[in-house]
């Protein structure tokens, strides 16, 4: 049996995934980190990004994570996220609509900033 680590991926509102793995890759404020059995203990802050889990059975689990913490000690890895979704659970069309809405909001904000600048110039 290969060396394993126990992984718990938990969102603020639910347990997302739990099981045995041989490798977990996550994005932290210090950069991407890969954790394997026997890794030195660590505590870090998660950035928004993908988490990739190589399961003990040879499969791969991918999740989208937004903020939170990563903790590892004694071959137990905890990913405590503000928001986390397994890739299989994500509705692509809904995610694309949300992205377009965010882009349009950013454009509206840029237009507001430009309007304020123009009004400031008019007052001079």
From Swiss-Prot:
It holds the Pfam family ATP-synt_DE_N. It is a peripheral membrane protein. GO terms for molecular function: ATP binding; proton-transporting ATP synthase activity, rotational mechanism. GO terms for cellular component: plasma membrane; proton-transporting ATP synthase complex. InterPro entries: ATP_synth_F1_dsu/esu, ATP_synth_F1_dsu/esu_N, ATPsynth_dsu/esu_N. Coiled coil: none annotated. NCBIfam families: ATP_synt_epsi (TIGR01216), PRK13442.1 (NF009977). PANTHER family: ATP SYNTHASE DELTA/EPSILON CHAIN, ATP SYNTHASE EPSILON CHAIN, CHLOROPLASTIC. HAMAP family: ATP_synth_epsil_bac. This is ATP synthase epsilon chain. It comes from Streptomyces griseus subsp. griseus (strain JCM 4626 / CBS 651.72 / NBRC 13350 / KCC S-0626 / ISP 5235).
